A protein has these predicted regions:
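N-terminal active-site segment of His-dependent metallophosphoesterases
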Residues: 1-87
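Conserved catalytic scaffold of divalent metal-dependent phosphoesterases
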Residues: 77-168
Length: 168
């Protein structure tokens, strides 16, 4: 289907909460097919791209934290799996020539970053570095409750006003 720009300023695909590696594989396949069909000008990842469960305070509540030598392999595995998931989407974005890409950090990435900041020697595991956002061509938008990503008249954020009560 040829792309028509009649009355369209920009086309975008926006994806929230993929939670790699716990993602729904069929849903990700649909996203990839939608990208091929829509051929968006802009792609926006609304965060929680990774699950990062081992770095959540919820995960460790009531448990003893594992020693660092056990956590590093979990961290490496999670980083690998999340990058693999992002690669699936980026490959399709590359194929259709979508170069405007935004990554809005979600609370799950905040879990990762909070863990990493406690151990300065792990700085290469911060979201921006671990997910290779610069190399992938993403503009990075840290988790920020006061400032949203704004494109035209639309605002994009992770979870700010998107609960079941968002319209009240």
């Amino acid at each position: 289907m040829p792309k028509s720009n009649d009355g369209v300023i920009k086309r975008a695909i926006v994806t929230p909460d993929k939670h790699f590696p716990l993602h729904d594989k069929k849903a990700i396949n649909v996203v990839c097919k939608a990208i091929e069909l829509v051929k968006p000008d802009v792609y926006i990842d609304l965060g929680d791209t990774g699950e990062w469960e081992h770095f959540s305070t919820h995960f460790w509540k009531g448990r003893n934290a594992k020693p660092m030598e056990d956590l590093i392999p979990l961290l490496d595995s999670d980083v690998h799996e999340v990058n693999k998931g992002m690669d699936m989407i980026d490959n399709v974005l590359d194929k259709i020539g979508c170069s405007e890409r935004h990554f809005v950090q979600g609370n799950h990435e905040v879990w990762l970053d909070k863990f990493v900041t406690r151990y300065p020697y792990l700085s290469h595991y911060m979201t921006y570095e671990a997910l290779k956002l610069k190399q992938r061509g993403y503009k990075y938008h840290p988790y920020n409750r006061k400032k949203c990503l704004k494109i035209g008249k639309l605002n994009f954020t992770h979870g700010k006003y998107t609960t079941k009560y968002h319209s009240y």
